[in-house]
Amino acid sequence: MSDLTDAPQANTDTLTTSAPDKLSGFEWWRRSLQYRTGMGISEDEKKQFEHDYRAKSLPKQCTDCVANLDWMLNYSPSVIFMMDHVKKIGGNISKSNIICDVCDDYKGGGFHPEGGILLCSNWITDKWQLEDILTHELVHAYDFLKFKVDLTNLKHHACTEIRASMLSGECRIFNEIKKTGLGDFGKKFQSCIKRRAILSVSANPNCKDTQEAEKVVNTVWQSCFNDTRPFERVYR
């Protein structure tokens, strides 16, 4: 699963979309400005704006997701490479089972051995993020076939998450500098991979807590971080 650790948190409260006059024109501009500046807006109003923004954006997000997926399947070196290697070891991932859809959960996508790959159009912000997420999920698909991953085994889960975040480009150094600045420059790549792997493993029903997830990730770190198959090295 590809987690979106740096996007706005999803609101779990039950909200309804505001009236049409609040979703366009001057009123929408005013609400957008309040949200961006944090001035004159309550926490409840922030949650309502986030809900309205997602509802207002859904049709375009789904259209963009499908268009960007088509582009990546034809032109992205990492996606084409991973699709080819999944196919070589018996996988059946294709455009027919890579689906753009709306997700309630706070994630960018997911992989299921029988269902294929899900891309969460309402959380994906641009073409290049979709490329990272799709590559991430294709690494999971490869691992399930190549290494017989069993997600009830936390070490298996940790290893495939380490590899997926490492090989997908999600933790490329310039992304991390944008998020966290220049501090600990030499450790940013590894820190990002560990953070994402721990977050994913901690959500596993068989994991007791974050401390256990961190322990498992550290246990398998050396072998999994050094395994770049099917790539020769980390390119992205």
UniProtKB/Swiss-Prot annotation:
GO cellular component entries: mitochondrial inner membrane
A GO term, aspect molecular function: metal ion binding
Domain of life according to the entry: Eukaryota
Regions annotated as coiled coil: none
Keyword Mitochondrion: yes
Active site feature: E137
Alphabetical list of InterPro entries matching this protein: Peptidase_M76_ATP23
Positions of a divalent metal cation binding: H136, H140
Keywords recorded for this protein, A-Z: Hydrolase, Membrane, Metal-binding, Metalloprotease, Mitochondrion, Mitochondrion inner membrane, Protease
Membrane disposition: Peripheral membrane protein
Main location: mitochondrion
Cellular localization per UniProt: Mitochondrion inner membrane
Signal peptide, first to last residue: none
Assigned protein family: Belongs to the peptidase M76 family.
Free-text function comment from the UniProt entry: Has a dual role in the assembly of mitochondrial ATPase. Acts as a protease that removes N-terminal residues of mitochondrial ATPase CF(0) subunit 6 at the intermembrane space side. Also involved in the correct assembly of the membrane-embedded ATPase CF(0) particle, probably mediating association of subunit 6 with the subunit 9 ring.
UniProt-recorded name of the protein: Mitochondrial inner membrane protease ATP23
